[in-house]
């Protein structure tokens, strides 16, 4: 049984892609689901159990394995959510407020294109609607959470912290990680100091 990694320095490393190897995928996914079941969680990334490969699992509607997942599209709409993380014990006692895209499109090596989003999108934000009970939205948030892990991003990082200011008004440190969007719609995570010159070329912080 692999233990859950809690060392932030290790967790902030960007992992490498998993080479095509079905037997290795099966071994890693089995270890992930075993750890996930023990911890009673919703999702887990390979680097959370000490395997620095781009792979994660989700278990909400049904068990799902994502090999080399990459978010290729995000909705413009976002939602404030509350998240905890098995690798950050303090957040299990005191969850963090975060902001997540309402829907995302993920490309994977094993499942092809996967769409994540709420089951009742038209009800999100309406009076009296408990969107925390929407399994589709929960699955979407967990997918973003786990893919963040693979990119070395934690829910305690400034990029994920809930902030009522508009993005354009936020203040970033030179080494803070931000997500930028190119004029072509591609997104990637880079340090703010590297993002600044790109803003003049039509890139946006999202």
Describe each model-derived feature in a short phrase.
Residues 1-206:
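Positively charged
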